[in-house]
């Protein structure tokens, strides 16, 4: 019966387009939640989520809040990462860092390195940016009190303190054993050879 009424209404609207069709719109008025209703809603959500409450989720988010490294404070892992990338590329190589940066880097190792005591050893005299002898890239090095030097990955330390987005993690850091190294050829220019030049010449 309701279907027939809708069909009649739509036909009459098509026949006489000037005729206005009255429609009642049900408006949902927001109703204030009492404390008991809110508690019941949270408890049902908690049961649906397998026992996780919002308070636990908030606690997890707080871990990604501001972090102090020495006198410097970082709100996100990306901001922390960007700071160290800029520092690494703009600081002159083989030059001791200043006291401010020394405190930041020391705190980075203490809070983010997997084995800080082993890395620090008998104490850190200074930090430097050096060209890594094997990788030929700029790296942070710490110089201990006994003048031994060791490099460390600021990226891994940052990721330990505040987890980095997946696309910024080190290759192979996801624990699957893949990644790292140069890999073998492939891609746009193929595997071996293919150096400079254009076409093959006879």
From Swiss-Prot:
Source organism per UniProt: Arabidopsis thaliana
Tissue expression pattern: Expressed in leaves, flowers and embryos at globular stage.
Record note on disruption phenotype: Embryonic lethality due to embryo development arrest at globular stage.
Annotated segments matching region Disordered: 1-69, 168-202
GO cellular component: nucleus
Name of the protein described by the UniProt record: Protein EMBRYO DEFECTIVE 514
Gene that produces this protein: EMB514
Coiled coil start-end: none
Biased composition (Gly residues): 174-202
GO biological process terms on file: embryo development ending in seed dormancy; nucleologenesis; regulation of cell division
């Amino acid at each position: 019966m309701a279907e027939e009424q809708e069909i009649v209404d739509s036909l009459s609207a098509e026949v006489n387009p000037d005729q206005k069709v009255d429609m009642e719109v049900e408006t949902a008025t927001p109703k204030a939640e009492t404390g008991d209703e809110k508690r019941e809603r949270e408890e049902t959500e908690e049961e649906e989520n397998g026992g996780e409450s919002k308070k636990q989720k908030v606690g997890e988010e707080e871990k990604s809040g501001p972090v102090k490294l020495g006198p410097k404070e970082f709100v996100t892992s990306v901001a922390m990462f960007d700071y160290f990338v800029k520092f690494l590329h703009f600081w002159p190589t083989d030059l001791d860092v200043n006291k401010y940066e020394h405190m930041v880097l020391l705190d980075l190792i203490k809070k983010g390195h997997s084995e800080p005591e082993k890395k620090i050893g008998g104490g850190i005299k200074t930090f430097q940016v050096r060209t890594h002898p094997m990788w030929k890239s700029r790296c942070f090095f710490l110089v201990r009190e006994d003048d031994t030097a060791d490099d460390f990955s600021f990226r891994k330390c940052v990721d330990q303190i505040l987890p980095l987005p997946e696309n910024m993690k080190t290759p192979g850091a996801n624990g699957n054993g893949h990644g790292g190294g140069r890999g073998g050829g492939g891609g746009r220019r193929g595997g071996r050879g293919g150096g400079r030049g254009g076409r093959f010449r006879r």
